[in-house]
Every structure is written in C-alpha cells, then in structure tokens.
Amino acid sequence: MKSAVETLSPTRVKFTVEVGFDELQPTVAAAYRKVAEQVRVPGFRPGKVPPPIIDRRIGRGVVLEQALNDAIPQFYGQAVDEAAVAVISQPEIEVTNFADGEGLTFTAEVDVRPTIELPDPESITVTVDPVTVSDADVDAELAALADRFATLKPVDRPARRGDFVTIDMTVRLDGEVLEDGTVTGASYEVGSAQLVEGLDEALEGLTAGQSAEFDAPLAGPYAGRTARAEVTVRAVREKQVPALDDAFAQQASEFDTLEELRAHIRERIGRTRRIQQHVQARERLLQTLLDSLDIPVPERIVDAEVRSRAEQLRRYAEARGMDAEGLLAQQGESLHDHEAHVRADVERELRVQFLLDTVVAREQLQLQEAELTDYLIQRATRLGVSPDDYANQLVRTNTVPLAVADALRGKALTYLLQRVRVVDTTGAPVNLEGGSTPAAEAEPAVSEA
C-alpha cells in the first residue's frame, strides 16, 4: 500500500491511497467466504460454495463490491496510522479506481486536530480572587438560617412588605378571565414579586377582608398587553424570626453555643469559596491559554453542532407550543444573536478540547481505574442517576470512548493547573489543594466524530 497526505487546511487533510491487487487478495478471499455464507446453492452446504460457482451464480462483481467495502476502512486506517494524525470526523471517501486485477485507489478527506505549540506551563501566572470571609458574610448566613426557623403570627393591621398574606385573585384581559388567572387561598409574601406585576403595591396597606384592583402588565404570549386584576386579602400574618442566641444554635444545629455555630458557618463559607477559587483558576488558566494560542476549528464540525443545537431548541420550544424565535423573544434575545452566541460557544468548546487533547497526547496521560470510577460517579450525580445506570447508558449508546476522552481532558487541566503559578489579586501565592473540583466540571464536550 502507498499513501500520501495533502494538507488542505490546519484542520483538514486529504489522503490518497493506492493498494495493489495482490494486497487485496486476502480481502477478496474473505469476501468470497462472506458471500458463501449468504447464498444457497443445491449440493453445497452454507459457507462451502466454491468461488467459481459464486461467480457463475451471482457474479464476481458482487464479491468485489464486498471486498471494496471491507478494504477501504482497513487501508484507510493504515494510512491514518502511518501519517500519525488525530482524525476527528468521519472521512469523505471517493474511489478513483477499482477494477478486477488492477487494484484500488481512493481518496479520503477528513478533519484532524490542529497542531498546537503549547507554552511551558511553569511560565504562566494565573491571578484569582483571594478567599476571605467577613463577619458580615457570617451574619448574612445566620440571618438566612434564622429566617428558615421563623414562625407566622396572625396580626390585625394593614399588610406591609415582609408579611405573608392569604389572598384570592382574579386576572382578566378584555373582560375575560385568563387561563390560570384565578388564585384562591394562596399564601403570598408581600414584596416578593412572585406573581404578577403590580400585586405587591396593591397589597401594601390592605387589611384582612379588603380588596383592591390594579393594572397588571403581562408577559409570555400576552407580552405588551395589560390585564385588570382584583385581589382580596383573607388574612395577614407577620413573620417572627427567632433571636440569635445559644438557644437558637441548639434548635437549628448540633452546636451548643452561637459562637460555635458562627465558627462552623465561617469554615463552611471558606470551604465553598476555596472551591470557587479553584474553579476560577481553571477558567482563567484556560482563557489565558486560549488568548495566547491561535487554535483553528473545523467549520464542518462547528456547523453540524450548531445545527444540532438549533434542532434541540426547536423541539424544546415546540413542546411548549411555541417556535424558537418566540421562545427566545421571551428571554430578550433574537434568533440571530442566539445563533451567533451558540456558534461562539461551540468554537470555544472545540478549542478547549483540542488544547486539552494536545496535553493528553504530549504528556501521555492515562486514566487509572479509580479516576474513571470517580468521573462516572460525579457525572451520574450531576445527572441524577445511579453510577451503574449511567455506565450502562454509555455502553448502550457506544459513548464510552467519549466519556473516557472527557475524563482525560479534566485530568489534563488538573495537570496544567498543578504546574502554573497561581496568585491572588494581592500577589500572594495560592495553594489550591483542598479546593479541587471534579474533572467532569472542566468544559462541555462537542461530539467530534
């Protein structure tokens, strides 16, 4: 076999492969055996029909076609191995010559991972925010905890912000009650802005038994129109928050004193922020590398992924009785802008994958069994399924190699992060140990092939 590689672009090559007919003989012989298993000829057992009989009965051309279908993947794979390129898509094959006795010539165009010259990670400095926990941070957490233990006490006074009221409400448009426009006996926090615009202002100052009408600007399919709403207050209750003392600490936690509870909250906030700092370091390292490297992406893969995501959006909108443009309009985004954002996201995801795949290849990183197990557990947890179910899903969908590649990229990012210099905004060195994040969190994956 002879093969040549022509570089069409930094992300696409063209193979020209020539295979002599002598080299095809094993493939032709195997094709005869396959065909013999499929034909039934009186006097011969299945699989035992001689080639001359097959030629006379169904024609040698059928056998040669089978041999061609088997030979192309085999010799294409050999050509890829010899060229030592990382293919990332299915090849576009064109047979330029194949005749009985003359051998085979074909071309294959395919997308490849671009060559990336990585900088020495030890020359890179990543700056992150420092981890600090103030008394105000602890106070805010304590206040939120106390709020969860608050009780509601009926009061005989006008409603004000922070009160909980029991209400009946009807919303009409052009005199007709809207679908889902009736609320009966609902508990509502005044000032929470959770139902319709204008409700909070209408409720303030009302006592139990009083009603009010107000204009309610609508959203969704009625965006731009204004309904008329009527609300009646049936009861007003005041939220009573427990005092922050040792008794509260014993009620709300396993600690005996408020100071012990405060110390625990401070430590928990610090732990969370160290994880956030680690995530920030990963993101800023990736962005630093992307900014310093020119990493091309194959347009065919980008276009295919953009189309796939557009179809997902279309189905999502359709399931809600809308089209994609209408759904995006509710979110304040045009279809054109959305497509531009999706394309930019896909291109960035591909660049990150190429970057990390290059690290994997250069450093010959491999996954240990425990690392793969951790990755599967983390991914399963994020998806809300058991690790066994997630692993079985990967097997059923033939996506185990994609999961392994994704886990390796996470390991590559960790490898880089361990070798760069990390400082906070004051210039102090940062030790990221203890703030590690799962490999599954690294970057969303784009299916390449």
From Swiss-Prot:
Enzyme Commission number(s) from the entry: 5.2.1.8
SUPFAM superfamilies associated with the record: FKBP-like, Triger factor/SurA peptide-binding domain-like, Trigger factor ribosome-binding domain
Compositionally biased tracts (Low complexity): 438-449
PROSITE patterns on file: FKBP_PPIASE
Keywords: Cell cycle, Cell division, Chaperone, Cytoplasm, Isomerase, Rotamase
Gene Ontology molecular functions: peptidyl-prolyl cis-trans isomerase activity; protein folding chaperone; ribosome binding
Reaction(s) catalysed (UniProt annotation): [protein]-peptidylproline (omega=180) = [protein]-peptidylproline (omega=0)
GO CC, any one term: cytoplasm
Principal subcellular localisation of the protein: cytoplasm
Signal peptide (UniProt feature, chain positions): none
Region span, Disordered: 428-449
Locations listed in the record: Cytoplasm
Family: Belongs to the FKBP-type PPIase family. Tig subfamily.
Family matches, as HAMAP family: Trigger_factor_Tig
Function: Involved in protein export. Acts as a chaperone by maintaining the newly synthesized protein in an open conformation. Functions as a peptidyl-prolyl cis-trans isomerase.
Domain remarks: Consists of 3 domains; the N-terminus binds the ribosome, the middle domain has PPIase activity, while the C-terminus has intrinsic chaperone activity on its own.
Protein name: Trigger factor
Gene label: tig
